[in-house]
Structures are given as C-alpha cells and as structure tokens.
C-alpha cells in the first residue's frame, strides 16, 4: 500500500532530505550528532512534515519506534494502555539506540485524561523510552505534558517561505517525472502557493488528479478556495446572513484546514 500512496512512497528518510528551514533542520541535526532524542513536542500546521521528521530522526539513529494517531478516539486509550505500554517497558535487542521512541501523532486531538496518562508514562519509562508528540495547536497540550518536552515549532516565515516553496516545487517535479505524469508548471506553482505549507495535501491532490494522466488547470477547480478574509470581515461587521452563506459554501472543506486558515489570519 505504501508503494502506491505518493506521500508514503516519497516520504523523506533522513533529516537532510526533509524540506525545512535551516534553523529547524539544525535542531534535529544536533540531536543526531549527540545520538540523543529528548521528549519533544513538534507544533505546526498540517502537512508541514512533523511526523516525517520524527520518523526520519528515529531511522537515522536506529531507534525502534511506534506510532499512535491521537485522532483515533475510539481505540486510542486502549492502545496507549496496552500496546504502547508494552512497547515502552521492554528493552530492544535489535537496536543500538539508547532509547525506544513512541510517536503520538495529532496529540492535540486527545483529551485531558489521556494527556495526563501520557505524562505519567514519560516519567515511568524515562530510562527506556522517549516520546515525540506532534500537534497543530500547542495550546491544546496541557502544561504538565508541555513542560516535559522540548518544543520545536515548524514555523516558516518571511523570506524562508519562497525558498521552501521553491524546494518543494523541485521535489514535486521529481515525483511527477518518476510517476510519468505530465504537469503544467504554472499550475503546480499556484497549487503550492494555495496550500503552503501543507505539502501532504498538495501531493495527495496531485496523485488524485493524475489519474487522467496530466495535471492542468482543472485541478485548481477540483476543490474550493477558502476566503477567510471574507468571513472575518462579515463577522466584524456583524453581517451574520453572509456568515451563514460562507459556512454553507465551505462545508466540503476539511475542518482542521479551515480552523488553521482562520487561526493564521488572526495571528
């Protein structure tokens, strides 16, 4: 299955191969140089590469790791109490790394009781296991858990945006060439700018649309744009009839993406 899904097939396996600002990349290279992985909280927008970096760090250090998705509310608590606890409490015989690693993806989707349980696990298994949490909104992580982690924010600012977008554009061209998919370069640029820095969404959209054999302007009409400024303007003016129209017209968009766009516009 991973050979079919582009996001998995072309997922970077090393920190060097990850598309990130140099300042962020240096942080993880320093961890590689010391051979140590601290408990970490990786915060930033969806699709920017938080989980990819966590996996790449483990791969390069040869650390055994176990991934749990915090969005799986139904089974998450049982998975943490059983599978994760068993993983964290045993010593790896096949790895030379100092610690095992548990990656909690989308940790901001977990409840307070789960986060307090994870805090207890950090202390209980400190000698054998490290925890890496990823989140879109770090303010949703409780202070007792937050304070036990080194926080790395995946923020891309100012001039870095153009540089990082250009690197992803080249990576996207490479992937499309490998997959033998024709593409209009101007369309790719517009697509990247539209969803920056959500690389996962760009790649998923390209793969979905590539079934026709070519990526052209049609992909830009395949999903609706989100005019967040219109929403904020109407809210400030208390024009609630227009707000309702905006909500209805954006029902098909992902909730997390909408919230992120609004959050970024406010801050």
What are these regions (language model features)?
Residues 1-160, 167, 207:
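P-loop/Walker A NTP-binding region and its immediately flanking N-terminal helices
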Residues 166-267:
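AAA+ P-loop NTPase domains with strong preference for DNA replication initiators
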């Amino acid at each position: 299955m991973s050979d079919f899904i582009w996001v998995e097939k072309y997922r970077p396996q090393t920190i060097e191969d990850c598309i990130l600002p140099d300042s962020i990349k240096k942080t993880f290279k320093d961890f590689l140089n010391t051979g140590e992985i601290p408990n970490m909280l990786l915060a930033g927008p969806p699709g920017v590469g938080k989980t990819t970096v966590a996996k790449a760090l483990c791969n390069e250090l040869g650390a055994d790791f176990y991934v749990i998705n915090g969005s799986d509310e139904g089974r998450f608590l049982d998975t943490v109490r059983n599978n994760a606890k068993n993983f964290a409490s045993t010593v790896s015989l096949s790895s030379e790394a100092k610690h095992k690693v548990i990656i909690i993806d989308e940790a901001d989707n977990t409840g307070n009781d789960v986060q307090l349980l994870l805090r207890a696990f950090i202390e209980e298994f400190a000698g054998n296991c490290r925890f890496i949490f990823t989140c879109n909104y770090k303010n949703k992580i409780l202070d007792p858990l937050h304070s036990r982690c080194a926080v790395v924010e995946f923020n891309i600012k100012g001039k870095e945006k153009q540089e990082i977008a250009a690197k992803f554009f080249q990576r996207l061209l490479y992937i499309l060439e490998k997959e033998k998919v024709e593409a209009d370069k101007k369309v790719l640029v517009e697509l990247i700018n539209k969803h920056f820095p959500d690389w996962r969404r760009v790649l998923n959209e390209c793969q979905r649309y590539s079934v026709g054999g070519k990526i052209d302007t049609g992909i830009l009409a395949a999903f609706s744009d989100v005019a967040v400024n219109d929403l904020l303007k109407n809210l400030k003016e208390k024009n609630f009839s227009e707000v309702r129209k905006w909500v209805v017209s954006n029902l098909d968009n992902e909730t997390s993406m909408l919230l992120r766009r609004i959050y970024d516009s406010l801050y």
